[in-house]
């Protein structure tokens, strides 16, 4: 009996509703400026790897040790991803199976801590992550979570305070990492504190992994017992996670924590896409993109601390940035984070409202916006374009701005930098 007609039919025929969604989303991405700090545009080669026949293959286990037959080719794909990740970051161990950053983080904690152990991470409201000890998250339910914060005057992490917290709580795990913090972390100081209290040091570099890969950000790998990351964000790979370590003695625990501890079958099509992304991340072209990413963020920060922005009540947390994002502080502005997000959306710039440390407003409103430059650097933006984007953002955040005129300026930029040429869905 032949395969039924729908098997080989195109998406537009089988499911026109979803086909329309894909077309509309492609149009949105092409016609707007994507500046959510956790988003990026993946290369077409990554899309091709992920949208492949590898989606059909079940492969519980690890290369050479599977619980299913027919894994000879997916073994090659996973081993390529492992070897490329290790080479890219200078690690001795890599697990490329985590479905997401959160899954990777859950596996890390399962490998290096026991339920009820104390963990110490950056406070969520000060730029930390849900998986670093938020009470409603698994990390806050399974573990005794303590937190360090930022200085109320500088908004920087004070390592003396981190040490005091570590001595007070005696955690089994110290977490260095963030979701909204615009400066480098002092990995050597974190290592010293962890050694002093007998803790494991886990670095979550989900946001800055691409910068590390390009050599434009300090690497945590030589200092941490374990490093986790997403593969999207600055790495511009598929939405997924990875775990790294220089300690081969932890390899068995980390592998077991991922499978069977957190997951069953790995997503082999996603793992193949990770391999492709890691290969691209080792190129000079990728490194140039990361340099432009940081340059763009610093141009934006400088524009938002200019006199006219300051007069409009806008400031920049920590006064600048070392990474791919800027945190605009609107506590003295007549508009809040939600209103700023909406205004920027209207002109065609996508950001997310974000709480700032000691924020007087609720989390669904906030007093800040988090603005990232990775996707625009991927699109090809350089100094000239980032200067224009920064001015558009600064003008949008002023009360009474001509949003229609600003939208026209955005369209000039998007028209000049086509995205996914030739792609229809």
Curated annotation (Swiss-Prot):
<protein>
    <recommendedName>
        <fullName>Serine hydroxymethyltransferase</fullName>
        <ecNumber>2.1.2.1</ecNumber>
    </recommendedName>
</protein>
<dbReference type="Pfam" id="PF00464">
    <property type="entry name" value="SHMT"/>
</dbReference>
<keyword id="KW-0028">Amino-acid biosynthesis</keyword>
<comment type="subunit">
    <text>Homodimer.</text>
</comment>
<keyword id="KW-0963">Cytoplasm</keyword>
<feature type="site" description="Plays an important role in substrate specificity">
    <location>
        <position position="232"/>
    </location>
</feature>
<feature type="modified residue" description="N6-(pyridoxal phosphate)lysine">
    <location>
        <position position="233"/>
    </location>
</feature>
<comment type="function">
    <text>Catalyzes the reversible interconversion of serine and glycine with tetrahydrofolate (THF) serving as the one-carbon carrier. This reaction serves as the major source of one-carbon groups required for the biosynthesis of purines, thymidylate, methionine, and other important biomolecules. Also exhibits THF-independent aldolase activity toward beta-hydroxyamino acids, producing glycine and aldehydes, via a retro-aldol mechanism.</text>
</comment>
<feature type="binding site">
    <location>
        <begin position="128"/>
        <end position="130"/>
    </location>
    <ligand>
        <name>(6S)-5,6,7,8-tetrahydrofolate</name>
    </ligand>
</feature>
<dbReference type="InterPro" id="IPR015424">
    <property type="entry name" value="PyrdxlP-dep_Trfase"/>
</dbReference>
<dbReference type="InterPro" id="IPR039429">
    <property type="entry name" value="SHMT-like_dom"/>
</dbReference>
<keyword id="KW-0808">Transferase</keyword>
<comment type="pathway">
    <text>One-carbon metabolism; tetrahydrofolate interconversion.</text>
</comment>
<dbReference type="GO" id="GO:0019264">
    <property type="term" value="P:glycine biosynthetic process from serine"/>
</dbReference>
<dbReference type="InterPro" id="IPR015422">
    <property type="entry name" value="PyrdxlP-dep_Trfase_small"/>
</dbReference>
<feature type="binding site">
    <location>
        <position position="124"/>
    </location>
    <ligand>
        <name>(6S)-5,6,7,8-tetrahydrofolate</name>
    </ligand>
</feature>
<comment type="pathway">
    <text>Amino-acid biosynthesis; glycine biosynthesis; glycine from L-serine: step 1/1.</text>
</comment>
<dbReference type="GO" id="GO:0030170">
    <property type="term" value="F:pyridoxal phosphate binding"/>
</dbReference>
<dbReference type="GO" id="GO:0035999">
    <property type="term" value="P:tetrahydrofolate interconversion"/>
</dbReference>
<dbReference type="GO" id="GO:0005829">
    <property type="term" value="C:cytosol"/>
</dbReference>
<dbReference type="InterPro" id="IPR049943">
    <property type="entry name" value="Ser_HO-MeTrfase-like"/>
</dbReference>
<dbReference type="InterPro" id="IPR019798">
    <property type="entry name" value="Ser_HO-MeTrfase_PLP_BS"/>
</dbReference>
<keyword id="KW-0554">One-carbon metabolism</keyword>
<dbReference type="GO" id="GO:0004372">
    <property type="term" value="F:glycine hydroxymethyltransferase activity"/>
</dbReference>
<dbReference type="InterPro" id="IPR015421">
    <property type="entry name" value="PyrdxlP-dep_Trfase_major"/>
</dbReference>
<comment type="similarity">
    <text>Belongs to the SHMT family.</text>
</comment>
<keyword id="KW-0663">Pyridoxal phosphate</keyword>
<dbReference type="InterPro" id="IPR001085">
    <property type="entry name" value="Ser_HO-MeTrfase"/>
</dbReference>
